[in-house]
């Protein structure tokens, strides 16, 4: 439903933003884009976003931390993919890098790579070639050093 510019008020924009945020966490950029697609004027959108930030309903750092925890711990993604996904969701590059670096200290990448391998290649797949494990980890966004350490460890453990 597109808003008519002559009918748009601070209240209507704020109500639309509340509806967006009620469904799930969003970055500032995502809320801006969704309100813009609904046809609200830029000035009203900016006023709304400022108000949401003042109220604490819109906080890119908090959202980035939450998303990063999910990506690294639950989805077993590497830092490269997590950082890329944060930026795609409207988190600024510097903030994305900072949040991912902090999360990495709590949850080392080698642990995430081990979990990813264990989840993808169970005991039934002992004959998985090393190249396949390497490619899988790289597709999950793990850096080269972690990929090769985890893949070598996986290879050693399946033989031994």
Q: PLM ranges: what are they?
A:
Residues 1-160:
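An alpha-helical, amphipathic repeat domain used for nucleic-acid recognition
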């Amino acid at each position: 439903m597109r808003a008519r510019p002559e009918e748009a008020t601070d209240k209507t924009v704020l109500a639309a933003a509340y509806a967006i945020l009620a469904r799930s966490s969003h970055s500032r950029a995502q809320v801006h884009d969704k309100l813009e697609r609904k046809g609200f004027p830029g000035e009203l959108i900016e006023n709304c976003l400022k108000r949401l930030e003042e109220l604490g309903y819109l906080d890119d750092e908090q959202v980035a931390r939450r998303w990063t925890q999910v990506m690294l711990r639950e989805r077993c993604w590497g830092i490269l993919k997590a950082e890329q996904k944060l930026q795609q969701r409207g988190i600024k590059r510097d903030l994305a890098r900072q949040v991912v670096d902090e999360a990495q200290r709590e949850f080392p990448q080698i642990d995430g790579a081990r979990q990813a391998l264990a989840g993808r290649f169970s005991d039934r797949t002992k004959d998985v070639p090393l190249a396949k494990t390497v490619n899988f980890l790289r597709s999950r966004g793990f850096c080269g050093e972690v990929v090769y350490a985890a893949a070598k460890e996986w290879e050693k453990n399946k033989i031994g």
